[in-house]
A protein has these predicted regions:
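Disordered, acidic Ser/Thr/Pro-rich linker "stalks" and the adjacent N-terminal cap
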Residues: 18-120, 131-136, 165-173, 179, ...
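Beta-sandwich interaction modules
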Residues: 30, 114-116, 156-210, 322-371, ...
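Acidic, glycine-anchored loop motifs typical of Ca2+
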Residues: 89-98, 244-255, 570, 601, ...
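A short beta-strand element within beta-rich, extracytoplasmic domains
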Residues: 121-133, 200, 280-293, 405-418, ...
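Exposed low-complexity, polar/acidic, P/S/T/G-rich flexible segments that act as propeptides
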Residues: 123, 206-227, 368-397, 407-413, ...
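Short coil-to-beta strand junction motifs in C2/discoidin
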Residues: 133-141, 294-303, 420-424, 624-628, ...
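Low-complexity, intrinsically disordered segments enriched in Ser/Thr together with acidic residues
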Residues: 664-695
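Short loop/turn motifs at secondary-structure boundaries
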Residues: 676, 723-835
């Protein structure tokens, strides 16, 4: 009940009287940083949704979105025809009610269709859909190409393979070419056929033909393609080259792989690939069969590992780390390819989808033969990854949020949808200092230096943006994840600047969370640089101890506090306190800040010692503060005998109000406190039970606007009390049974037994039991049985057995038992019953 009350009073401000900073619009969300490439969708009404990876897609539909460089020029995917080009786009628009038809007056040699998918795909089937109400094309041939040159000296001519030809006049509206019989060199089935180009040649004219759609059905979206667009990356050893080319969608580029056998680590034949986000993956494949060469391109073996980023205690070597972290790797492929003929295409399928973000590849087994390899090793020409479902983990980070002035941020809330198996996790960090940076972009959106920008022609110069960035050493670490909407703000406050990080995660591929808004509640700050400490710093568990909590303010260099009347005129503190509330104006913290040229705050003396060219700006800031006249202390048990001092002077008990609950102590002070001279000392007695007991402290000058007071940074763990004896020793302490002899005859004298004890070193709920036995060990009665934790217990026994009957006179054994977090403990005493 006490804990609930603490949370309730600390959350009061989010209900009324607070200012709010709300993030809820499409424009606001689009200023956040998050993986691109369809991983996150921001809707027009301001919802943040997680992207979905599709299965069995038609690769023709988005062909025009892909482009590549070929023979020195940029080429876009799309469709070309030999006749009536004005309606050619209808062939790949996904609409079967539109169609393309060649001009009947054109020669038959112009009746053809060329489709360039813009990237290499794995085709499961090609489907031609002819227009309804028109005559299907009766005779035609279908060719496909991986976009490889047929002749070295004639680079514009591609190598095509005939995959289908009508052997009798076609009369069907749909014609399909299936690639489900594709196999590798050893007869193992493959997922489909690699191709980029489709050519359809019509061999017979009809009067009213119409081709509505050409579809190329693939296993799904190729997750690998947008690695770099999402912010992913790949690092690799020096004897693998240009690994980023294995996921560029082009079969004629790739990575060479030195055949190092088991010595892959020392010879640097590895790559560590970050997809930029986590995905549900059910298959991946790669090919060593690319452009024609005079030497072999196969790998003699390899191993592949995957990870979702789960942290591990250590890594076998630094190359396994991702962003400096050790992660858990799972081996999903171990292939010895020293076979004849060597395999060139590899499909890896999973019985159940796996959460994958990181892929680690290294060569293994053979070392090759230089005469057939030209010292080049093997090749990976293209690597594809497939899956289905919502992206299981997406992280978004806010731009720097500027509240305009120092504020007391009290709580954070959010609105979203979390189906079962999904989570919205939010954390924050705050800071005192930022630097303004200028960023330069060209018209294409590429960032560059100021010098590069100024060298560009005017027509190629893009926007110049000014933005604020944190100066890291003045910023806090990320807070713990907030437990739910309305949680107390966990980062240092008051603050002017903050960052928010959101993680949208799911344990299932068929559901995902979505986020509508985040709201910060804040008010005027009580003041800056408040800190708290508690004394003594050590105590005994389960026994009353006298504690003193001190709250004080420290002034910054160059800081002054000024008082004003309601007309803005500066007055003295003494005069301000004598004014009626309606006439009082603001109390203001005025500060002067000195910076070096890099934006780091320095002292005035350091600034004056710098050469003028190395000096940064001098800034003057003013922040209105409320001061505080309420203090709340979270206590391990009910506080007693409370005393108060302000500025070292005792405050009479009738001059302040005390409210005591089981785990909180609240005081209403006789005046508002602003300055270091008015340090506040609260003395009280209470009983600690847990080692590392934290005395959290809050102050307020506005009803409900509680501001957390951090521990004094000068002293380590300044508000934490240690109980050294709890590091060892029994769970049950201070067991007392009184009286040792009872006479339960109803005369009101020694009629019942009082059993008191302290439970220590138990943090979770555990069974606490008190049981009575006779001298023969037979159970007489279980007097107490309940889930409990560390604390003082007092149990009574009136001398009756489990049936409610009076026990006969004699000696009995009283046993106290506690099932601890890691062990159990028992303690017992004898008692005597007489009549």
């Amino acid at each position: 009940m006490g804990t609930y009350f603490l949370l309730l009073i600390l959350s009061t401000l989010s209900g009324a009287g607070a200012e709010r900073y709300v993030i809820s619009t499409e424009e606001q969300w689009k200023q956040w940083s998050y993986p691109s490439g369809g991983i996150v969708e921001i809707t027009p009404d301001g919802w943040v949704k997680v992207g979905y990876i599709r299965k069995d897609i038609n690769a023709c539909l988005d062909a025009p979105k892909f482009s590549y460089k070929w023979l020195g020029r940029k080429v876009k995917g799309g469709v070309k025809v030999g006749s009536n080009s004005g309606t050619s786009k209808n062939i790949i628009d996904g609409d079967t009610t539109t169609y393309w038809a060649p001009n009947p007056e054109d020669d038959l040699k112009d009746w053809w269709v060329d489709i360039d998918l813009g990237r290499l795909v794995t085709a499961k089937k090609i489907r031609l859909i002819f227009a309804g109400g028109r005559t299907p094309f009766p005779e035609f041939r279908i060719y496909v190409s991986k976009h490889l040159q047929k002749y070295a000296k004639l680079p514009k001519i591609l190598e095509y393979d005939l995959v289908a030809k009508t052997v009798k006049p076609n009369t069907e509206r749909t014609f399909e070419v299936n690639f489900d019989s594709e196999k590798d060199r050893h007869g193992n089935p493959l997922m489909g056929r690699y191709l980029q180009n489709i050519r359809i040649v019509f061999d017979k004219k009809v009067e009213d033909p119409g081709l509505a759609e050409v579809e190329v059905i693939t296993p799904g979206e190729n997750i690998a393609l947008k690695t770099l667009e999402r912010g992913g990356k790949v690092k690799y050893g020096g004897r693998m080259t240009k690994v980023e080319q294995i996921f560029d969608g082009l079969i004629w580029t790739g990575s060479t792989v030195t055949l190092a056998g088991a010595d892959w680590l020392r010879q640097h034949v590895w790559c560590n690939w970050d997809l930029g986000a986590t995905f549900w993956v059910d298959a991946m494949r790669f090919t060593s069969e690319g452009r024609h060469m005079r030497w072999r391109s196969d790998l003699e073996g390899f191993r592949i590992y995957v990870s979702d980023g789960t942290e591990a205690p250590t890594s076998p070597a630094d190359v396994w780390k991702v962003d400096g972290k050790d992660v858990v790797w799972e081996r999903i492929a171990d292939v010895d390819n020293k076979v004849s003929p060597p395999r060139l295409n590899f499909d890896i399928k999973f019985p159940k989808p796996k959460r994958i973000r990181y892929i680690f590849f290294h060569h293994y087994y053979g070392t090759g033969y230089w005469a057939t390899r030209a010292s080049a090793g093997g090749y990976i020409w293209e690597f594809q990854i497939f899956g289905e479902g919502f992206v299981p983990g997406v992280t978004l980070r806010s731009p720097l949020i500027d509240l305009g002035k120092m504020n007391n941020i009290t709580s954070i809330s959010w609105e979203g949808i979390t189906p079962p198996g999904t989570k919205i996790e939010i954390r924050t960090r705050t800071g005192e200092r930022v630097r303004e940076v200028t960023r330069y972009f060209d018209k294409a959106g590429n960032e560059m230096t100021k010098e590069q920008y100024e060298r560009l022609p005017k027509f190629r110069q893009g926007p110049i943006k000014k933005e604020k960035q944190p100066i890291e050493k003045y910023w806090s670490k990320w807070s713990p994840v907030y437990k739910g909407p309305g949680a107390r703000f966990a980062s240092p406050s008051p603050s002017r600047y903050l960052l928010i990080e959101v993680n949208l995660s799911s344990e299932r591929p068929d559901v995902a969370p979505s986020l509508k808004s985040i709201t910060l509640f804040y008010s005027k700050a009580v003041g800056s640089r408040l800190s708290a400490e508690v004394n003594p710093r050590t105590a005994e568990p389960g026994r009353p101890e006298r504690f003193k909590v001190v709250v004080r303010k420290r002034m910054y260099e160059g800081e002054v506090i000024s008082w004003h009347d309601k007309w803005g005129r500066k007055i003295t503190e003494e005069r301000w306190r004598k004014l009626p509330s309606a006439i009082r104006g603001p109390v203001v913290e005025e500060r002067t800040h000195w910076y070096d040229e890099e934006g780091n705050e320095i002292t005035k003396e350091e600034w004056e010692e710098l050469k003028p060219g190395k000096r940064g700006k001098v800034e003057h800031t003013k922040d209105e503060i409320t001061g505080f006249n309420r203090i709340l202390i979270k206590t391990p048990s009910k506080a007693e005998d409370v005393k108060l001092r302000i500025g070292g002077r005792p405050v009479p008990p009738d001059s302040f109000v005390v409210e005591v609950r089981e785990d909180t102590l609240t005081l209403d002070l006789p005046k508002l406190v602003f300055t270091p001279e008015d340090s506040v000392e609260v003395e009280f007695s209470c009983v600690p039970y847990f080692n590392g007991t934290l005395f959290e402290v809050f102050v307020a000058g506005i009803p409900g606007a509680w501001q957390m007071v951090p521990p004094d940074p000068v002293r380590k763990n300044a508000t934490t009390v240690m109980l050294p004896s709890l590091t060892k020793g029994p769970l049950i302490r201070n067991l007392k049974i009184t009286p040792r002899v009872i006479t339960p005859n109803g005369d009101g004298y020694n009629d019942e037994l009082s059993i008191s004890f302290t439970v220590s070193r138990v943090e979770g709920l555990r069974w606490v039991k008190v049981t009575l036995y006779n001298v023969e060990g037979r159970l007489i009665r279980e007097v107490y049985r309940s889930l409990g934790t560390s604390g003082n217990y007092k149990i009574r026994w009136e001398g009756k057995d489990g049936s409610g009957d009076a026990v006969p006179p004699g000696v009995y054994l009283c046993e106290v038992r506690v099932d601890g977090d890691a062990t159990e403990d028992r303690a017992n005493r004898t008692v005597v019953v007489v009549y």
